[in-house]
Amino acid sequence: MIPITSFAGKTVAVFGLGGSGLASCQALKAGGADVVASDDNIDRLVEAAQAGFITADLHSVAWSNIAALVLTPGVPLTHPAPHWAVLAAQAAGVEVIGDIELFCRERRLLAPDAPFVAITGTNGKSTTTALIAHLLRQAGFDTQMGGNIGTAILSLEPPAAGRVHVVEMSSYQIDLTPSLDPSVGILLNVTEDHLDRHGSIEHYAAVKQRLVAGVPDGGTAIVGVDDDFSATAAERVALDGKTVLRLSVKRPLANGIVVENNAIYRVTDGEREAIARIDGIGSLRGLHNAQNAAAAAAAVLALGVDREALQRGLRSFPGLAHRMEQVGRQGETLFVNDSKATNADAAAKALSSFEEIFWIAGGKPKTGGIDSLAGFFPKIRKAYLIGEAAQEFAATLDGKVDYEICETLEVAVPHAARDAAASELVDPVVLLSPACASFDQFRNFEIRGNRFRELVTALPHVEPVV
C-alpha cells in the first residue's frame, strides 16, 4: 500500500467504492486523513462500513470541511453530464481528483526522481504496460505495475529511489490527474472510443494528449504517429517545447522509432540503428503488437536497460490472456484466444496476423457487424458462428466464406479443430476473435476466453506452446 500523507489531518471524500475506491480509502486513512466514503451502490457502502470507514450520503455533508473529492474513474466527470457528487464538490470549490493524482503527489514527496512510466492509447495500452513491466523485471529492476491494467495503483509498494512504477491509464484516469508528470509518457494511438464520456473525438484526443504533455524536462515523451489525432498531439507537445520521440510502424521517419521487417530501429537524422528484433515472438505477432513492442523498447532503453537484456525480455514475454493468447497446439494446428476482440476493428488485428484461419466469431453484435472485415475473408478457411450474431454474420459471409452456425463454443471448438486437422494446411490456426461483446452467453470476455481455453485443453493431444 502507498499511504497518502499529503492529506494528513484533513477530511477527504471518496466516491465510488469499487477496487480502486476502497484502495484509496485505505491509503488515505493510512496516511492520516479522515475519510468519508460514499457510493450510489448500497452493497458497496455496507462493505466500506464493514472495513471500518465512515460512510455518508454526500448530498448532506458539509463540503466546507472537505479538502478533496477522490472520484473513481467509472463516475462521469464531464460527459454526458457531471455526476451530482462532482457538481456538489465543484460548487463548494473542492478539487475533484483520482487515485493516480494521489500517487503523483506522494511520489513528489517521497521520491521525485523515482521512475514513473505512464501508458495510454485507445488500443494496446495493456499489452504495452505488461511488456514494459516484464522487460524491466527481467533486467533486474524493482518494478511495480498497476492502474487501469487491474491493480489499483495505491495497492502497490510506495515510490522509492530505484523503484519503477509502470501505470496504465485510461482517459478517465487522465482526466482525474491534473498534475500528471510521468518521467516516461507513452501515447500509442487515438481512435474513436468512449465518446459517451468525452462528448467528441477531439476532447477524447485532448485528454489523451495530456499524458505526454505532462512529461517534465529531461523525461521521455513517446507518441505513436500512425493516426491523425496522435500525430497532431505530437506536434502540439513539441510546439510547447517538449522533446517528443515519434514512433511509426507504417512509414519512415527522419527521427524517432520505426519498425520494418520485424526489426525495431532508432532513427536519428535519417540514420537507422537497429535496437531489437521481434520476428518469431508469438506473443508479439501482428502490426499492432509491433507498435506495442517498439514503444516498450523505447521506454526501457530510456530507463537504462541494455539492448541484450531488451532482446532477452522480448523473447520471453508471455503475452496477456485473451489478447492473441496462444493457448495450445494440436499437431500443426495453433489455437489462439483473442476473446478481448469485442468489435470488428479489434478482430481485424488478429485476422491480419495469421494466414490459414478457422475463425470462431459471434456473440452480442456491435453496430456495423463484420462488413469492414471483408478484406480478410480470403484468409478464412471456414467460420464457426456463435451467439446472437450468428445469423447476421452468416448473411455477411454467405457466398464469400464457408461457414457453420454452431451457436456455442462447445460446438465450435471441436468442429474447428477437426476441420483444421483435416485440412492438411501448413500452420492452420483456430482463432477465437469474436468481433462481438460476450454478454449474450458470458458475463465478460474473460469468462468467454477461459471457456475457450478449457475446451481447447480438453481436446486430445494438445500441447502447450513453447
UniProtKB/Swiss-Prot annotation:
Native organism: Rhodopseudomonas palustris (strain BisB18)
Function noted in UniProt: Cell wall formation. Catalyzes the addition of glutamate to the nucleotide precursor UDP-N-acetylmuramoyl-L-alanine (UMA).
Subcellular location(s) of the protein: Cytoplasm
Gene3D superfamilies per the UniProt record, alphabetical: Mur ligase, C-terminal domain, Mur-like, catalytic domain, NAD(P)-binding Rossmann-like Domain
Binding site for ATP: G121, T122, N123, G124, K125, S126, T127
Protein name: UDP-N-acetylmuramoylalanine--D-glutamate ligase
Family: Belongs to the MurCDEF family.
A Pfam family per the record: Mur_ligase_C
GO terms under cellular component: cytoplasm
Catalytic activity: UDP-N-acetyl-alpha-D-muramoyl-L-alanine + D-glutamate + ATP = UDP-N-acetyl-alpha-D-muramoyl-L-alanyl-D-glutamate + ADP + phosphate + H(+)
MF term (GO), any: ATP binding
HAMAP family according to UniProt: MurD
GO annotation terms (biological process): cell division; cell wall organization; peptidoglycan biosynthetic process; regulation of cell shape
Entry keyword Cell membrane: no
Main location: cytoplasm
PANTHER family the record matches: UDP-N-ACETYLMURAMOYLALANINE--D-GLUTAMATE LIGASE
Gene name tied to this protein: murD
UniProt EC number: 6.3.2.9
Associated pathway: Cell wall biogenesis; peptidoglycan biosynthesis
InterPro entries: Folylpolyglutamate_synth_CS, Mur-like_cat_sf, Mur_ligase_C, Mur_ligase_C_dom_sf, Mur_ligase_cen, MurD
Keyword annotations of the record: ATP-binding, Cell cycle, Cell division, Cell shape, Cell wall biogenesis/degradation, Cytoplasm, Ligase, Nucleotide-binding, Peptidoglycan synthesis
SUPFAM superfamilies for the chain: MurCD N-terminal domain (SSF51984), MurD-like peptide ligases, catalytic domain (SSF53623), MurD-like peptide ligases, peptide-binding domain (SSF53244)
